[in-house]
Regions:
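Surface-exposed, charged secondary-structure patches
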Residues: 70-113, 119, 137-138
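Extracellular/periplasmic metallocenter environments
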Residues: 118-120, 144-154, 158, 167-168, ...
Length: 266
């Protein structure tokens, strides 16, 4: 009798298991395809696929409040950088919502490659899985490295530059966006004894060094940012994203509105 009950319970779970597996396969197929699509040089079929698999919300923080707005400026909306092939082990499906971690291999101003990590959320609408939000994901933080709180807001970085962990040069940031706009945290090494804005204006490669970036951090989101161990000297946090409260979301860059901050490592 007990064996019969267990068998019936097991068989009753099969449809749920199959449904879950099918949903995971469907989501992963969409994400894999979306990761490969680029704007400039992309095919019409690829662009159509992209538009069919995003919600109005997906690009709203970048000045495209609807899918139709994205379609009208498709190459710029999608961009020219494909994502790395996704890994299925990071995929989680819960009903009509799914999340997955994706990454992009980028090149720094010095020519070095680095990884950007993103958390992508998809929703199922009318039987179709669509990208709904994308925000910066967590970096792997080495054991023994402390997290220093860093809040993003309009238009400032909130943290304690006198924190002994920052002064030591061995730390990572736990970033939280407490504002209403999308922000980023770009970490720079100021190598010359001159104002940061002056060095940026001259674009002197010997004056400022790029160390990392966490982007985009959408309102209400948080992310852990790994940082290389810093030597003694001046460093800066800066946000280059445009003021999204301006018409079309293309206002002046946040740093021009005050979102720049310096700290020193001893």
């Amino acid at each position: 009798m007990l064996k019969t009950i267990l068998l019936l319970l097991t068989l009753s779970c099969f449809p749920l298991l199959i449904a879950c597996t099918n949903s995971e396969d469907e989501v992963f197929e969409v994400v894999t395809k979306m990761a490969s699509i680029v704007g400039p040089g992309g095919t019409q079929d690829d662009h159509d696929y992209y538009l069919e698999h995003i919600t109005d919300n997906f690009n709203s923080t970048w000045g495209y409040p609807t899918v139709a707005d994205c379609a009208a400026d498709i190459e710029e909306c999608i961009g020219d950088s494909p994502l790395d092939p996704p890994k299925k082990q990071t995929l989680k499906v819960d009903g009509n919502t799914a999340t997955i971690t994706v990454a992009a291999t980028e090149q720094s101003p010095t020519g070095d490659t680095f990884k950007l990590v993103f958390d992508l959320t998809l929703v199922k609408q009318d039987g179709v899985w669509k990208g709904d939000t994308i925000t910066a994901g967590d970096d792997k933080i080495p054991s023994g490295v402390d997290l220093v709180p860093l809040e993003l807001n309009e238009m400032l970085f909130s943290y304690d530059p006198t924190d002994v962990r920052i002064k030591s040069g061995k730390f990572a940031f736990h970033i939280e966006n407490k504002g209403d706009q999308v922000h980023e945290a770009v970490l720079l090494h100021i190598k010359k004894d001159a104002p940061l804005v002056e060095l940026m204006e001259t674009r002197d490669p010997e004056g400022v060094g790029f160390l990392g970036v966490k982007v985009p951090v959408i309102p209400g989101a948080d992310a852990k940012m790994a940082i290389p161990e810093l030597e003694s000297g001046r460093y800066a946090l800066i946000c280059f994203l445009p003021d999204q409260s301006a018409p079309g979301g293309e206002g002046p860059p946040h740093f021009a509105l005050g979102m720049v901050s310096e700290f020193e490592v001893e």
